[in-house]
């Protein structure tokens, strides 16, 4: 049997929701991001506090009042995750999904709602010999061999127009997106290729200490010659 809900106490640690209010929380539909994505209903009710109940949240969502990355989403289970931009036109407000100090997802109000940063996780050849870039949230766009896996690209949404290209290289500004250091920002100090089935390792130079983590947890957010991320990270 397919589980439509999951127990609130067993919800992913990225859910910043009360654990002892009620027994069940909505389970996200298959779609963008991974199992730690937030269902849109939970975001509207528990994070943005636009509704007191699930029924009220579903009504808001089904009325088309919530946009994710510039597109109206009416599925209350639609998965929302890192760097997604959630817009409420009636309130003239937009939020980017980021991390709080404990590595949990939190919506932070931003002005650059027309921009989203993507990590390139793979490249494939499609019909006509064109290169398709496979991005971290399941998005696919056509690109070129100038783009490498682990690089990031800045897109204008919802058009998916490329605005900038951020290379995965020493000195690049990065955010750690998994593990105990999720949400911390630093610069790539070194990159170690592991000659085994184990993941490659990246050492990130932080403000107070160096952090070594796996490459999957490293997301380029700024260029090596810049002191600022290319999007508003609320820091």
UniProtKB/Swiss-Prot annotation:
The keyword Metal-binding does not apply. Gene3D superfamilies: 2.30.30.30, 2.40.50.740, RNA-binding S4 domain. The gene is rps4e. Transmembrane segments: none annotated. SMART domains: KOW (SM00739), S4 (SM00363). It comes from Archaeoglobus fulgidus (strain ATCC 49558 / DSM 4304 / JCM 9628 / NBRC 100126 / VC-16). Belongs to the eukaryotic ribosomal protein eS4 family. Keywords: Ribonucleoprotein, Ribosomal protein, RNA-binding, rRNA-binding. GO terms for cellular component: cytosolic small ribosomal subunit. InterPro entries: KOW, Rib_uL2_dom2, Ribosomal_eS4, Ribosomal_eS4_central_region, Ribosomal_eS4_central_sf, Ribosomal_eS4_KOW, Ribosomal_eS4_N, Ribosomal_eS4_N_CS. Disulfide bonds: none annotated. This is Small ribosomal subunit protein eS4. NCBIfam families: PRK04313.1. The keyword Ribonucleoprotein applies. GO terms for biological process: translation. Residues 38-101 form the S4 RNA-binding domain. GO terms for molecular function: rRNA binding; structural constituent of ribosome.
């Amino acid at each position: 049997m397919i589980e439509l809900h999951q127990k609130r106490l067993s919800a992913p640690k990225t859910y910043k929701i009360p654990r002892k209010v009620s027994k069940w929380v909505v389970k996200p539909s298959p779609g963008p991001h991974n199992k730690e994505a937030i269902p849109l209903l939970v975001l509207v009710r528990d994070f943005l506090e636009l509704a007191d109940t699930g029924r009220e949240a579903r009504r808001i969502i089904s009325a088309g009042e919530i946009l994710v990355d510039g597109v109206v989403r009416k599925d209350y289970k639609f998965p929302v995750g890192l760097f997604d931009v959630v817009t409420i036109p009636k309130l003239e407000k937009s939020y980017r999904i980021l991390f709080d100090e404990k590595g949990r997802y939190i919506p932070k109000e931003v002005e650059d709602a027309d921009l989203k940063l993507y990590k390139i996780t793979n490249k494939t050849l499609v019909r006509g010999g064109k290169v398709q870039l496979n991005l971290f949230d399941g998005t696919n766009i056509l690109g070129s061999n100038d783009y490498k896996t682990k690089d990031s690209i800045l897109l204008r949404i919802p058009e998916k127009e490329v605005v900038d290209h951020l290379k995965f290289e020493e000195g690049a500004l990065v955010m750690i997106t998994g593990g105990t250091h999720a949400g911390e920002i630093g610069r790539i100090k070194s990159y170690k290729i592991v000659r085994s089935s184990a993941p490659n390792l990246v050492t990130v130079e932080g403000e107070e200490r160096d952090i070594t983590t796996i490459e999957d947890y490293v997301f380029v957010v700024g260029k090596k010659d810049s002191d600022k991320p290319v999007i508003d990270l609320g820091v």
